[in-house]
Amino acid sequence: MEKLASAAALIGKRRPERPVRGLRPHAAGRAARWFLEKFPGDVAYAYKANNSAFLIGALYGAGIRHFDVASLPEIEDAVTIPDAHLHFMHPVKSRHAIRRAYELGVRSFALDGEDELDKIIEETGGARDLLLWVRIAVPSINSRIPLERKFGVSGQKAANLLIKTRQAASELGLTFHVGSQTTTPDAFVTALADLHKLIVKAGVMIDRLDVGGGFPSRYPDSDPAPMDDFMETILAGIETLPVKENIRLMCEPGRALVAEAESLIVRVDARRGHDL
């Protein structure tokens, strides 16, 4: 594979007629190492962000061993990664996908309703080795793609679901997602405050907490707050929760790990003024 110092160097040397992928494995590795150093828990790469072998290899080389998978094809791909811990975090899954995932060794499943919980119990044969995550609906504040109306449960339904899931789970987790490309940490403040109320209402012991994804990357039209601000806000919010001191944490960065690691160089044949 040819190595060049920059996109400009490539254009000057090759004058490509067709689109060219620019790969920067060091960028993915740098981002992964930052999360592994700053976040005191499991860093699960959101597989759907980009599952190219190049990027997965760069993340694995930096130390990533947990993966947030959202479909059976993703699981069948990721299960080949040595020492991988897979978390099936899509809260709506087919019976076949649940059953096959369990056969492939997946023990971590997300849900946001009693119907989904019943499916998981039935398709795993009432297994007692499950890590079950209840996904809570939280507000999406300053996010490019809000998810609050798509997935999650709230209020008394959430409390009831937590109680029922506690009975079926070897480990019980809480998870949420503040929305994709969230540019300020405000959403995490609100989400963790909502979780505080829910834990008190349900009165159950939580074994794990997943703060989800939404961690941003920089684009020409998006200048998010520094990543350190997100981490400080999240960890401060966790400190206020009525959970055990040694609760195991997880986060699910996607674009924040890989957005700067790959680009596509294309030729523009014409433009009108400064418009593209």
Tell what function each PLM region has.
Residues 1-130, 166-169:
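A charged N-terminal "starter" segment
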Residues 25, 29, 95, 114, ...:
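Non-membrane alpha-helical structural segments and their capping/turn regions in soluble enzymes
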Residues 26, 48-52, 70-73, 91-93, ...:
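Active-site beta-loop-alpha junctions enriched in small/polar residues
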Residues 42-44, 66, 85-87, 108, ...:
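Structural preference for beta-strand elements that scaffold enzyme active sites
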Residues 56, 79-80, 98-103, 120-123, ...:
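Short acidic, glycine/serine/threonine-rich loops at helix termini
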Residues 104-111, 144-155, 178-186:
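Flexible, glycine/proline-enriched loop segments at strand-loop-helix junctions
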Residues 112-171:
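Conserved anion-binding
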Residues 180, 184-276:
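C-terminal active-site-proximal or functional interface alpha/beta core segments in diverse enzymes
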